[in-house]
């Protein structure tokens, strides 16, 4: 094994292609990394139930980071830490979504709600993340400017057309740092790969930060390396060219 001991992989736009599938090429090289002793960690904005099938497909029994770091798992189904988003803030975020008439969603610890199906009692629910989606960028920017004036929020995105909100301090980077503490690794031994703003902190904090070829420009600017796109098996390229190169 080379100098990198942990490979943190975003899912959408990174490990997954446009059909939300792991290509055979990516799967093969992830298995090569695992067999070489590298810890492969799924690191995603998705909730655990949505991320789990991909970890299972790759036969990973390693730590997982879900809802942008809101949950850290020592291995699938074994929760290490969970950081909640204040329900009063979710009420305000929800009201702003209604005001602008945009699509929105929220993750609680046991369900996902959205514009078509919202929770009956926001206050008593245990929230992890809230998000907005619209292709009307002026409206999206208006929402962003508003919530940037509020305290206690960590604001990122997972596409140019959404905004994702966690509790302040929650990020894939802080979660990766905790995973490293759990495993006895140093952040310099981490390769973090992603395509969106919710990946930037981890990309900057890791020994090797990698942006996908399809990544947003800010992500490419933050990364040390740009690999192929999610349609070109960019993750496999990272494993071949950096993770398993001794």
Enumerate the language-model features and the residues they cover.
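Mg2+-dependent phosphoryl-transfer enzymes with acidic/Ser/Thr/Gly-rich catalytic loops
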Residues: 2-6, 23, 166, 173-246
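Active-site residues of response regulator receiver
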Residues: 10
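Active-site phosphate-binding/coordination module
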Residues: 21-118
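Residue-level signal for inorganic ion chemistry
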Residues: 33, 44, 68, 130, ...
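Residue-level detector of anion-binding/catalytic polar loops
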Residues: 39, 103, 154, 208-209, ...
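Short, structured coil segments at secondary-structure junctions
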Residues: 58-60, 67-68, 150-151, 205-206, ...
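Conserved acidic, metal-coordinating active-site core of Asp-based
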Residues: 96, 100-205, 214
């Amino acid at each position: 094994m080379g100098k990198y001991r942990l490979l943190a992989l975003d899912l959408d736009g990174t490990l997954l292609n446009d059909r939300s599938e792991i290509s055979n090429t990516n799967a093969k090289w992830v298995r090569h990394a695992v067999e070489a002793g590298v810890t492969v960690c799924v690191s995603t904005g998705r909730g655990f139930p949505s991320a789990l099938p991909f970890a299972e497909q790759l036969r990973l029994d390693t730590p997982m980071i879900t809802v942008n770091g809101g949950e850290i798992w020592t291995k699938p189904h074994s929760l290490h830490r969970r950081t909640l988003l204040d329900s009063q803030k979710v009420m305000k975020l929800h009201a702003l979504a209604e005001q602008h008439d945009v699509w929105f969603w929220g993750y609680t610890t046991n369900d996902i709600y959205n514009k078509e199906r919202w929770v009956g009692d926001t206050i008593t629910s245990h929230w992890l993340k809230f998000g907005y989606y619209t292709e009307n960028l002026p409206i999206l920017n208006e929402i962003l400017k508003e919530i940037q004036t509020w305290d206690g929020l960590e604001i990122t995105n997972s596409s140019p057309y959404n905004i994702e909100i966690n509790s302040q301090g929650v990020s894939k980077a802080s979660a990766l740092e905790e995973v490293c503490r759990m495993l006895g690794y140093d952040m310099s031994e981490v390769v973090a790969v992603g395509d969106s703003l919710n990946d930037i902190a981890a990309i900057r904090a890791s020994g090797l930060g990698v942006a996908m070829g399809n990544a947003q420009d800010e992500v490419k600017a933050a990364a040390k390396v740009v690999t192929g796109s999610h349609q070109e098996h960019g993750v496999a390229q990272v494993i071949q060219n950096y993770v398993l190169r001794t």
